[in-house]
UniProtKB/Swiss-Prot annotation:
This is Chaperonin GroEL. It holds the Pfam family Cpn60_TCP1. The keyword Chaperone applies. It is found in: Cytoplasm. The lineage of its organism: Bacteria, Pseudomonadati, Pseudomonadota, Gammaproteobacteria, Cellvibrionales. It comes from Cellvibrio japonicus (strain Ueda107) (Pseudomonas fluorescens subsp. cellulosa). The keyword Nucleotide-binding applies.
Length: 545
């Protein structure tokens, strides 16, 4: 086992803090409507230019192991915010940095780290409650468009496009983002279905850029049982191989020898193939397989209807224009099913919705209707260069996550205003002792930091603006894009409540852990032995060359 270097107490925390600040300073430059860009070097090709906090955070890795641990912990804050709400990564990072900096000062002054953490946790919990209480529902196209615009760094064309997409496929529908071929953004609405199962083996991946499986015009085999014996699959595989088309298998499971053979065939290019587990469980799985069959014009191979795999032919297979899979989801676009049959199927499910008494069943049935009837909206991002395309695509994806979050939990006034109001709401909060009160104070001061950073990035004086916003009430805030004070919701500056809530929780959770750190352990750098010197020419051996 390699030797370790251990640091204790203040010296450990100071090194960790240095790493936190390096990463957070790079990320927070992107915050707000006047946030700056960050340029990321790529191992090949042009550098990437981004204003997306989590993209910047993911690129940073520091040479000093102790500083790097601090940076990685803040990176975790950004990733957590991104995973849970899809946005708010920069806000979460700014909050975490503020809490850690203030918290470590208090620890150095002799306060009890555990009480500080309890105070911070208490303040964050109350602030989250306040944010949820002031949220207003986000139902109409206008507010959806405003949320999308803010999240896409004040690009209204993106906000409008997302609002239009949501209008067309409904809030339950599926919206995906692709790279377009023209200079302008385009919106395509395609009949399709998405379900929450990903590829069964990473060896099926054929698009390395986004680690996904993409097949055009594939056959789709639907099986209502586990496939473990490759002999059962051979007749279908041979038929598909002759046709030259890809094959997508949707089954209860594909395992053992069958999965191994499919992987080998795929790698060798004999048959392009991908397998995915069928969505749902039990009777719901059977119903969803039947939905996919109706959508793709195929037949579910099930012993219940007297069909077995060995007797399956190409007639039993469904087809679709495109099937894409990542590790979590599969999307079937433009299935070859008859419109009349799809309509009948939707009607059947609607009858079940009316008859069911269980809320859970109703919700699942509504999801199935959305998948059959809602279709898939595809936003095609247009740009002049590849560098701009990648940056713009990342912004569209961010904006899409933000609008989904807004529809889910409502919106609050943006521009850091909601957090300033939360500070006022927890003004009377008290802990069990003085150190807990200090923790509450740390969290309250940290909640001002997103507004201050937005203002600083816009080139104004943070203290003056923060003071003016604090004196106001309700939705009164500062529009950094125009330099005007006013009602943030009327000005269309909205943040999804879920994004603000997640940023607070992620920052509080990880910053609390960092404040209570007492020791850090890292590998010692290995002293590599110096290379042996070259052997000089050895006299008398010339004849050997």
């Amino acid at each position: 086992m390699a030797a370790k270097e251990v640091k204790f107490g203040d010296s450990a925390r100071q090194r960790m803090l240095a790493g936190v600040n390096i990463l957070a300073d790079a990320v927070k430059a992107t915050l707000g409507p006047k946030g700056r860009n960050v340029v990321l070097e790529k191992s090949f090709g042009a550098p990437t230019i981004t204003k997306d906090g989590v993209s910047v955070a993911k690129e940073i890795s520091l040479k000093d192991k102790f500083e790097n641990m601090g940076a990685q912990m803040v990176k975790e804050v950004a990733s957590k915010a991104s995973d849970d709400a899809g946005d708010g990564t920069t806000t979460a990072t700014v909050l975490a940095q503020a809490i850690v900096n203030e918290g470590l000062k208090s620890v150095a002054a002799g306060m009890n780290p555990m009480d500080l953490k309890r105070g911070i946790d208490k303040a964050i919990a109350e602030a989250v409650k306040h944010v949820q209480s002031i949220a207003v529902p986000c139902a109409d196209s206008k507010s959806i468009s405003q949320v999308g615009t803010i999240s896409a760094n004040s690009d209204s064309s993106i906000g409008n496009l997302i609002a239009e997409a949501m209008e067309k496929v409904g809030k339950e529908g599926v919206i995906t983002v692709e790279e377009g071929t023209s200079l302008d953004n385009e919106l395509d609405v395609v009949e399709g279905m998405q379900f929450d199962r990903g590829y069964l083996s990473p060896y099926f991946i054929n698009n390395q850029d986004n680690m996904s499986v993409e097949h055009d015009n594939p056959f789709i085999l639907l099986v209502d049982k586990k496939i473990s014996n490759i002999r059962e699959l051979l007749p279908v595989l041979e038929g598909v191989a002759k046709s030259g088309k890809p094959l997508v298998i949707v089954a209860e499971d594909v395992e053992g020898e069958a999965l191994a053979t499919l992987v080998v065939n795929n790698i060798r290019g004999i048959v392009k193939v991908a397998a995915v587990k069928a969505p749902g469980f039990g009777d719901r799985r059977k119903a969803m397989l039947q939905d996919i069959a109706v959508l793709t014009g195929g037949t579910v191979i099930s012993e219940e209807v007297g069909l077995d795999l060995e007797s399956a032919t190409l007639e039993h297979l469904g087809t679709a224009k495109r099937v894409t899979m990542n590790k979590d989801n599969t999307t079937i676009v433009d299935g070859a099913g008859k419109a009349e049959e799809i309509k009948t199927r939707v009607q059947q499910i609607r009858v079940q919705i009316e008859e069911t008494s269980s809320d859970y069943d109703r919700e699942k049935l509504q999801e199935r209707v959305a998948k059959l009837a809602g279709g898939v909206a595809v936003i095609k991002v247009g740009a002049a260069t590849e560098v701009e395309m990648k940056e713009k695509k990342a912004r569209v994806e961010d904006a899409l996550h933000a609008t989904r979050a807004a529809v889910e939990e409502g919106v609050v006034p943006g521009g850091g205003t909601a957090l300033i109001r939360a500070v006022a709401a927890i003004a009377d909060l008290k802990g069990d002792n003085e150190d807990q009160n200090a923790g509450i104070g740390i969290a309250r001061r940290a909640m001002e930091s997103p507004l201050r950073q937005i203002v600083a990035n816009a080139g104004e004086e943070p203290s003056v603006v923060a003071d003016s916003v604090k004196k106001g009430s309700g939705n009164f805030g500062y529009n950094a894009a125009t330099g005007v004070y006013g009602d943030m919701i009327e000005m269309g500056i909205l943040d999804p409540a879920k994004v603000t809530r997640t940023a607070l929780q992620a920052a509080g959770s990880i910053a609390g852990l960092m404040i209570t750190t007492e020791a850090m352990v890292a590998d010692l750098p290995e002293d590599k032995p110096a290379a042996a010197p070259d052997m000089g020419g050895m006299g008398g051996m010339g004849g050997m060359m």
